[in-house]
Amino acid sequence: MSAIVDIIGREVLDSRGNPTVECDVLLESGVMGRAAVPSGASTGSREAIELRDGDKGRYLGKGVLKAVEHINTEISEAIMGLDASEQAFLDRTLIDLDGTENKGRLGANATLAVSMAVAKAAAEEAGLPLYRYFGGSGAMQMPVPMMNIVNGGAHANNSLDIQEFMVMPVGQQSFREALRCGAEIFHALKKIIADKGMSTAVGDEGGFAPNFASNEECLNTILSAIEKAGYRPGEDVLLALDCAASEFYRDGKYHLDGEGLQLSSVDFANYLANLADKFPIVSIEDGMHESDWDGWKVLTEKLGNKVQLVGDDLFVTNTRILKEGIEKGIANSILIKINQIGTLTETFAAIEMAKRAGYTAVISHRSGETEDSTIADIAVGTNAGQIKTGSLSRSDRIAKYNQLLRIEEDLGDIASYPGKSAFYNLR
């Protein structure tokens, strides 16, 4: 039995200089698991609650000492002595202990830190890499990365309303080659932006945030960077967008302030369809407000056969909401963010539900990250096929890519890279 003998929660900093929760779990054998949780900038209203202290005199109210205290007292007492290899039972214990629908009492940042640290300790005890512990012998598919190379919206201080412009290398034979492709495009884009006299400073997720005049100018510049790096847009590399439309939806309209547009749901669906016709866009995330299910239905009917429509704020990694979306034919993919739900067991349940329904699952970081690379292991352990973990700069993003390189090396000849087949539900 891999009995838990000690649990230590602590306050650490994330990549934006804000406090977050880290947890160590020590087992009877002496092995330890350590995990740190991320936090988001643009968040869905139905996400599990990230518990913050609210003391304005300390870290501007963003301290997490209450969540840490919950780990070191109540949670510690509840799971001390439990078998770390019984992940589902342990996570259920955390859920029941919290007793709320949204982890609002203990904090999802507390429950997730413990859930992840326990899994890491159990994997170490079993002598298995974390991805293998999660997925068993069937874990062998590397993910196609969504690489956020231009930031707008809530992630940047510029005139772009769309939050993320991403490249997805799909024409390569391995993750290693896909990563090289993305890095070369990143450097080509930096040179193009610099030559235009624009800023090459990077945003929260490592992408550039230049002041392009329009979304189309941004997309055309990215196409130029792909070609400058020696790759073919539409063949070797596809594009992806994260609209984060909930951020610019007001009074029943989509306000693209950077372009002087106020659009109805139907008009915004047409706007996105026009972009998908003009550019090799294979994926659009949060293309409608999280509560605009009628708009989502229009968008899905218009683009759902040829573009991956990812629900992030829409589904918030929650099986109850995802189930409703599947039944109503809303979107065709879910973004998986572990801190939106607060335990690994619930995260895996959302991935499994999506796959059973023919939806894709994209494993994702948050804008406030740490050096923790667990999501890389989740992506391979669940054979998700896609990962979204930022640009080709900032060590908090690169930590995940480097972990994926190690995993691919560990898998050796059995590692597979899906390329375009990652979008298995598109025609």
From Swiss-Prot:
> What's the cofactor?
Mg(2+)
**EC class of this enzyme?**
lyase
Q: In which pathway does it act?
A: Carbohydrate degradation; glycolysis; pyruvate from D-glyceraldehyde 3-phosphate: step 4/5
Which residues does the entry assign to the active site, renumbered to this chain?
205 (proton donor), 337 (proton acceptor)
Similarity comment: family membership: Belongs to the enolase family.
Against InterPro entries, the record matches this protein to: Enolase, Enolase-like_C_sf, Enolase-like_N, Enolase_C, Enolase_CS, Enolase_N
| Entry's localization field | Cytoplasm; Secreted; Cell surface
Q: Which reaction does it catalyse?
A: (2R)-2-phosphoglycerate = phosphoenolpyruvate + H2O
Instruction: One GO cellular component term, please give it.
Output: cell surface
Species source reads Ralstonia nicotianae (strain ATCC BAA-1114 / GMI1000)
User: Keywords in UniProt for this one?
Assistant: Cytoplasm, Glycolysis, Lyase, Magnesium, Metal-binding, Secreted
Predominant localisation class = cytoplasm
Positions with a binding annotation for (2R)-2-phosphoglycerate? 163, 337, 366-367, 388
| Stored PROSITE patterns | ENOLASE (PS00164)
Q: What is this protein called?
A: Enolase
Q: Which residues bind Mg(2+)?
A: 242, 285, 312
Name the EC number(s).
4.2.1.11
Which GO biological-process labels does this protein carry?
Answer: glycolytic process
Name the Gene Ontology molecular function terms of this record.
magnesium ion binding; phosphopyruvate hydratase activity
Cofactor: binding details: Binds a second Mg(2+) ion via substrate during catalysis.
Q: What does this protein do?
A: Catalyzes the reversible conversion of 2-phosphoglycerate (2-PG) into phosphoenolpyruvate (PEP). It is essential for the degradation of carbohydrates via glycolysis.
